[in-house]
């Protein structure tokens, strides 16, 4: 793999030095989650082949699955037409991407009557994941 980081200069980072990232399951096309990366996170993700995000609340790098074991192995990285959103196609180890114990963080569906309905089951109780 090239050690050049010129490709990172093509990313349009926001005023906080971050870029939004969509994690999509490579095998199914399911959107798993949305998160943020800074330059170091994106570079290390590309170098290691494992998803590493930037936690805005903790102000540090977050290795997806470091506590849960539900790592994301990167299959492909793409950038959108404006160079300001990253799409990361991944293999979701363990089948759980969400801290709620679900496959996807997008488990609530809007209904015509103005309610959100949970449409995906909890695959594993979060207490059993993070204990």
From Swiss-Prot:
Function (record text): Catalyzes the hydrolysis of the adenine ring of phosphoribosyl-AMP.
Name of this chain's protein: Phosphoribosyl-AMP cyclohydrolase
Family stated for the protein in its record: Belongs to the PRA-CH family.
Co-factor remark: Binds 1 Mg(2+) ion per subunit. Binds 1 zinc ion per subunit.
Lineage, top ranks: Bacteria, Pseudomonadati, Pseudomonadota, Betaproteobacteria, Rhodocyclales
Originating species: Azoarcus sp. (strain BH72)
Residues the record lists as binding Zn(2+): 81, 98, 105
Pathway linked to the protein: Amino-acid biosynthesis; L-histidine biosynthesis; L-histidine from 5-phospho-alpha-D-ribose 1-diphosphate: step 3/9
Cofactor field: Mg(2+); Zn(2+)
Gene3D superfamilies: Phosphoribosyl-AMP cyclohydrolase
């Amino acid at each position: 793999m090239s050690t050049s980081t010129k490709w990172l200069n093509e990313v349009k980072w926001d005023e906080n030095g971050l870029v939004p990232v969509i994690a999509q399951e490579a095998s199914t096309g399911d959107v798993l989650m949305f998160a943020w990366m800074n330059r170091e996170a994106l570079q290390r993700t590309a170098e290691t082949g494992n998803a590493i995000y930037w936690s805005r609340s903790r102000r540090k790098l977050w290795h997806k699955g470091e506590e849960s074991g539900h790592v994301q192995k990167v299959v492909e990285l793409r950038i959108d037409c404006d160079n300001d959103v990253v799409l990361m196609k991944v293999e979701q180890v363990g089948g759980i991407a969400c801290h709620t114990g679900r496959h996807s963080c997008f488990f609530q569906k809007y209904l015509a009557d103005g309610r959100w309905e949970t449409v995906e089951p909890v695959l594993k109780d979060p207490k059993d994941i993070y204990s």
